[in-house]
């Protein structure tokens, strides 16, 4: 632990787009809140918010992550990117 210091993920208590393998990465001064834009976030939960379109996000690589659909992409899914199965009206 290093209170008040910087970590590998960026300024505390959060960060902007980048690589965040496994775990939750709460937003903060390091990036937009309460979510983020496109980036690589395999295995993590990345709730949508001001950092990206409401209720979802645009293109990006998010394998293994929960990415609720919404304005960020087509209904019940999302825009281009590598995310494996994506439920939708065609499912």
Curated annotation (Swiss-Prot):
Residue stretches of biased makeup (Gly residues): 33-42, 49-63, 70-82
Annotated stretches, region: Disordered: 1-91
Domain of life: Eukaryota
Annotated protein name in UniProt: Proline, histidine and glycine-rich protein 1
